[in-house]
């Protein structure tokens, strides 16, 4: 296997150890170009709710050989087993097949007889913790029933720095608090169903352009390294790390490191983000897995905190691996300490036991690589047994109900001048626009949904699933209108503008459907290389709206999109009587929409992002051209914490629709704000102190002779194994640079297993436990002042004070039901983290002495209640 594994590892480690500052001469923030080293990689200790699972993990790992431990850490290769990623097995100890990891955050990818759930952005639009949990639980049940151990989701990266970022729809919202809560609830739901959840993509994975070298070169960009997202420490903590802290506190079992570099160190070998922030500061007890082919070194990644390499090979189907045999070699020759591989295995097995995989596990009953019933056991090389690979297990249960409910609960009513709800008495209804109809190639006609044909209910990429069916808006509206005795006329060709004009001129109400799509960078649709080229509507959408509006004075516009689109040309046209954003609602799309259109569901959704007048309104453009020669493109996050509504507030720019905005068929009033300091004597902040125990080791390493390929083993071509060809470690590694001195490439302290000092901001999963002590109670009275029952989403924002802070930041929210005339007192609390800022010098959270205020209302700019916060330190 001649591919310079140790050479790559050595160079990578040396660059970190020597604190090399990469060229970033174009930027204003030179200090952002460097990621400080942090070693050694913290070892798991089973804190809190992890204790029992950790104990069981230690027990089984103590019985494993080195090769068995390595087998758990390394995927067997792309298309080598049933799942998109699958580790080796440990049959001697009852792990008879490798751990199965499978996409995606909205349903099972590459499968059948599964559900297609609403996207993460729709969950954010509900602002509903219970619905987030129930969706996670339903997805977890389906993955479990298919034999999946690790669900590769949910996502909080990208967070949403760029409104045109290709994968923002997979996550939740550009607000860290909204994302963090729904991220955590989704994780709880998945893991309560017995499946390991994966918090991804960690971290600063905010655009698709330049995320992978080969992909970028395929689009004609001459780069040799992936993009570097360069951020300061305060912004990292207060914005991008925030939801991952919530995920760790919720007990997430796995974290997926990202393709991009962070401050010029690759995400899956960045000791600052993996060792320090995730494992030492946030106290993460689970395992870190690489994104697929985001693993760039052997020793460097192992020492920097990576625990699992996926899918195991360096490039898809090349049969080469940074780990596998090479990880075995590196432990035997002392390059990687035994305790580090022990910790990898313990972390993996701890997550396994924590969610109950030992009780629930069944073999994968589907193949990711074919829909045929029979196929090769090892698809990539057509080897192994020709066997039954698909059992066609229907795992949908009754999940269509929660999908339909979330679809309706996430339908944002942006504008309504009395057009909605429809009465059902409309005689002639026009349904206009391609986005209302079916994909002529079928709902799953485009691989990984990589096209924009028909209605948009899911965007594209690995974050997708096959639809079991797709109820289009046209189908659902037609069924509704016919049942009411009316007439419905549909034109779903966006080029048929004259026909649309004819229908619109005859209709009592015209429903216009438009969309905007995006996705993962390995697919380009109409020149959109994952990221959107702009924020305009797709498929001639503006012309469709203009045509219909000019012929019908009761036009309702429905937008299916991955994020914000530009609507400034037409949103205030008086003939546009209502605007709906329906996002990416999944398989029940049409039914969910009709429930809202006809008033069976009173809309309560709130937009999870800001609707600006222009792309420039959002700040810095997405990086679409290399800016560092053929080196790593440099994306400096110079805006700091000021993204989305925080950016608009800083610029004092009025958006078209602000973050948190959403109308209802009723009205709500806010009154009687009360703010009360809680007993602070028992809640003083206590920085964590002390040190860890020494790094534990489990079992004996043995010698090279113990890890030769087993006699009689029929090797599968390109399959990644942990064993050695020879007792000569240099020969087994087959690396021309074998034998380098450790001092040339091992970072200082990287192999130190002695007790290590605890970080002040650490101490428990999620960070210092006293960060989560409640300091202030806030209550307000919410009244339904209208004539229709409905849900309202009260939102609490805090002004943290200080000259360089956002005007307000969201901290708490809820979704409460109120009958007409009903009042409820909504009560919530603010904890220390809610009121603190990250102090870069102190490396800890600090409540500053600047005066602070609390604001309560229905959106980020409709905050009728406000009061000063009591001083709490």
From Swiss-Prot:
Q: Where, by residue number, is the active site?
A: 291
Per UniProt, the keywords (alphabetical) are:
Carbohydrate metabolism, Cellulose degradation, Glycoprotein, Glycosidase, Hydrolase, Polysaccharide degradation, Secreted, Signal
Q: Where is the signal peptide?
A: 1-19
Q: What is the documented function of this protein?
A: Beta-glucosidases are one of a number of cellulolytic enzymes involved in the degradation of cellulosic biomass. Catalyzes the last step releasing glucose from the inhibitory cellobiose.
What protein is this chain from?
Probable beta-glucosidase A
Which pathway, per its entry?
A: Glycan metabolism; cellulose degradation
**Gene encoding the protein:** bglA
> Quick check: keyword Secreted in the entry?
yes
What taxonomic classification does the UniProt entry list for its organism? Eukaryota, Fungi, Dikarya, Ascomycota, Pezizomycotina
Source organism (scientific name): Aspergillus fumigatus (strain ATCC MYA-4609 / CBS 101355 / FGSC A1100 / Af293)
Entry's EC annotation: 3.2.1.21
Q: Which GO terms describe its molecular function?
A: beta-glucosidase activity
Per its UniProt entry, which superkingdom is the organism in?
Answer: Eukaryota
Q: Which reaction does it catalyse?
A: Hydrolysis of terminal, non-reducing beta-D-glucosyl residues with release of beta-D-glucose
Q: Which SUPFAM superfamilies match?
A: (Trans)glycosidases, Beta-D-glucan exohydrolase, C-terminal domain
Q: Where is this region: Disordered?
A: 731-764
């Amino acid at each position: 296997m001649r591919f310079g594994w140790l050479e790559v590892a050595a160079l990578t480690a040396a660059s970190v150890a020597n604190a090399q500052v990469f060229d970033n001469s174009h930027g204003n923030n030179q200090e952002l170009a460097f990621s400080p080293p942090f070693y050694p990689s913290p070892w798991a200790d089973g804190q809190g709710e992890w204790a029992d699972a950790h104990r069981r993990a230690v027990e089984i790992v103590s019985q494993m050989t080195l090769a068995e431990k390595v087998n758990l850490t390394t995927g067997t290769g792309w298309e080598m087993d049933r799942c998109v990623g699958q580790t080796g097995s440990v049959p001697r100890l009852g792990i008879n097949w490798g751990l199965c990891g499978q996409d995606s955050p909205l349903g099972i990818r590459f499968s059948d007889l599964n559900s297609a759930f609403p996207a993460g952005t729709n969950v954010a639009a509900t602002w509903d913790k219970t619905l987030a949990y129930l969706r996670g639980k339903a997805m977890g049940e389906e993955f479990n029933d298919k034999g999946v151990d690790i669900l590769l989701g949910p996502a909080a990266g990208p967070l949403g720095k760029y409104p045109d970022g290709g994968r923002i729809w997979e996550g939740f919202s550009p607000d860290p608090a909204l994302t963090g809560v729904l991220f955590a609830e989704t994780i709880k739901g998945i893991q309560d169903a017995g499946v390991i959840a994966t918090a991804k993509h960690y971290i600063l994975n905010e655009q698709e352009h330049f995320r992978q070298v080969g992909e970028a070169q395929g689009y004609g960009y001459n780069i040799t390294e992936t993009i570097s997202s360069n951020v300061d420490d305060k912004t990292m903590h207060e914005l991008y790390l925030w939801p991952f802290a919530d995920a760790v506190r919720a007990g997430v079992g796995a974290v997926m490191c990202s393709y991009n570099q962070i401050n010029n160190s690759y995400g899956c070998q960045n000791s600052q983000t993996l060792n320090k922030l995730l494992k030492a500061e946030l106290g993460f007890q689970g395992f870190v897995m690489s994104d697929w082919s985001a693993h760039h070194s052997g020793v460097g990644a192992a020492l920097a905190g990576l625990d699992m390499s996926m899918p195991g090979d360096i490039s898809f189907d090349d049969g080469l691996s940074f780990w596998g045999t090479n990880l075995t070699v590196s432990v035997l020759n002392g390059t990687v300490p035994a305790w580090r591989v022990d910790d990898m295995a313990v972390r993996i097995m701890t997550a396994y036991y924590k969610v109950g995989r030992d009780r629930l596990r069944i073999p994968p009953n589907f193949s990711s690589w074919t829909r045929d019933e029979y196929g090769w056991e090892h698809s990539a090389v057509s080897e192994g047994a020709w066997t039954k690979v698909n059992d066609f297990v229907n795992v949908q249960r009754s999940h269509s109900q929660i999908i339909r409910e979330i679809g309706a609960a996430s339908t944002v009513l942006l504008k309504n001048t009395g057009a909605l709800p429809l009465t059902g008495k409309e005689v002639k209804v026009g349904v206009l626009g391609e986005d209302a109809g079916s994909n002529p190639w079928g709902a799953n006609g485009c691989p990984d949904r990589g096209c924009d044909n028909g209605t948009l209910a899911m965007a594209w990429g690995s974050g997708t699933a096959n639809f079991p069916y797709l109820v289009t808006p046209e189908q659902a509206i037609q069924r509704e209108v016919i049942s009411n005795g009316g007439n419905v006329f549909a034109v779903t060709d966006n080029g048929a503008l004259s026909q649309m004009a004819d229908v619109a001129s005859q209709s009592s109400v015209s429903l216009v459907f438009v969309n905007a799509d995006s996705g993962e960078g390995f697919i380009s649709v109409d020149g959109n290389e994952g990221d959107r080229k702009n924020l305009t509507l797709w498929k001639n959408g503006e012309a469709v709206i203009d045509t219909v509006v000019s012929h019908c004075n009761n036009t309702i516009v429905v937008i299916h999109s991955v994020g914000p689109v530009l609507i400034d040309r037409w949103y205030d046209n008086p003939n546009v009587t209502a605007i709906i954003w329906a996002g990416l609602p999944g398989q029940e799309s049409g039914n969910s929409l009709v429930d809202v259109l006809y008033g069976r569901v009173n809309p309560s959704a709130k937009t999870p992002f800001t609707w600006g007048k222009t792309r420039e309104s959002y700040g810095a453009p997405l990086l679409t051209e290399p800016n560092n020669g053929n080196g790593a493109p440099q994306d400096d996050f110079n805006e700091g914490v000021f993204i989305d509504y925080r950016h608009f507030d800083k610029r004092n720019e009025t958006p078209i629709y602000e973050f948190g905005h959403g109308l209802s068929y009723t009205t709500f009033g806010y009154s009687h704000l009360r703010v009360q300091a809680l007993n602070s004597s028992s809640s003083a902040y206590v920085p964590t102190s002390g040190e860890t125990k020494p790094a534990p080791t489990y079992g004996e390493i043995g010698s090279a002779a113990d890890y030769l390929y087993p006699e009689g083993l029929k090797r599968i071509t390109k399959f990644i194994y942990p064993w050695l060809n020879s007792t000569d470690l240099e020969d087994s590694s087959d690396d021309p640079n074998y034998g380098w001195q450790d001092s040339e490439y091992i970072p200082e302290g990287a192999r130190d297993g002695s007790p290590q000092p605890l970080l002040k901001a650490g101490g428990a999963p999620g960070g210092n436990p006293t960060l989560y002590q409640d300091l202030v109670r806030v209550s307000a009275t919410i009244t339904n002042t209208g004539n229709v029952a409905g849900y309202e989403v009260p939102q609490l924002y805090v002004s943290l004070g200080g000259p360089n802070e956002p005007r307000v930041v969201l901290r708490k929210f809820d979704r409460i039901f109120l009958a007409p005339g009903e009042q409820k007192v909504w009560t919530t609390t603010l904890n220390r983290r809610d009121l603190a800022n990250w102090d870069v010098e102190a490396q800890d959270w600090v409540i500053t002495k600047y005066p602070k205020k609390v604001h309560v209302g229905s959106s980020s700019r409709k905050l009728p209640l406000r009061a000063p916060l009591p001083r709490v330190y």
